[in-house]
A protein has these predicted regions:
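Conserved short alpha-helical segments that host acidic/polar catalytic motifs at enzyme active sites
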Residues: 1-177
């Protein structure tokens, strides 16, 4: 969760219903990321659970659905420029890649567009910064992203069922392109 000057990341392994153990309903913030995942490419380990922090940037985090085929090449390129990684997970590469783009003067929107050019594979990801949140999808929109929006909130998920508890009569559901 972010309130514009800090971000808190909670990681755990277990069912989403255990999230309430962390009293997230009491958090204050303008935006947040949450993620449940079925590990397909990396081991089931709390270090590999989402969201991923873009080290050493304390205000950038990413959640990702998909697989990057060029994450090792991108990781090596970023490591040569001094970045360090905590895992071998492809999602962490996205976080550091975007942080690097922002550090080099691109806006969040420009960084997201650049990621579509540079990341190879099938993916949809959400990224949170101190003052905003954004998303990117691969060119073929292989991985789904559903948005639920009304006057009170905007929520995104890779499956519509994850949004059902938030939907009211004035909520609009759509899949962005």
């Amino acid at each position: 969760f972010s309130i514009g000057n800090s971000m808190e990341i909670i990681k755990d392994i277990g069912p989403a219903v255990e999230l309430e153990d962390y009293k997230v309903a009491e958090f204050e913030g303008s935006h947040g990321l949450a993620h449940t995942r079925l590990a397909t490419e990396s081991r089931v380990d709390i270090c590999y659970s989402h969201p991923f922090w873009a080290r050493p940037f304390p205000d950038i985090a990413v959640v990702h659905n998909g697989q990057l085929t060029n994450h090792n090449k991108l990781r090596r390129s970023l490591q040569r420029r001094g970045y360090e990684f905590s895992t071998t997970n492809d999602s962490e590469v996205i976080a550091v890649f975007i942080a690097d783009q922002l550090l080099n003067g691109l806006t969040l929107e420009e960084s997201l567009i650049e990621s579509i050019e540079q990341l190879d594979g099938t993916f949809t990801y959400l990224i949170s910064t101190t003052d905003g949140i954004g998303f990117a999808k691969d060119r073929f929109s292989t991985k789904p992203l559903i948005v639920a929006e009304n006057k009170s909130f905007v929520a995104m998920a890779s499956e519509e069922v994850a949004l059902h508890s938030m939907i009211s009569e004035d909520t609009v559901l759509y899949e962005p392109t």
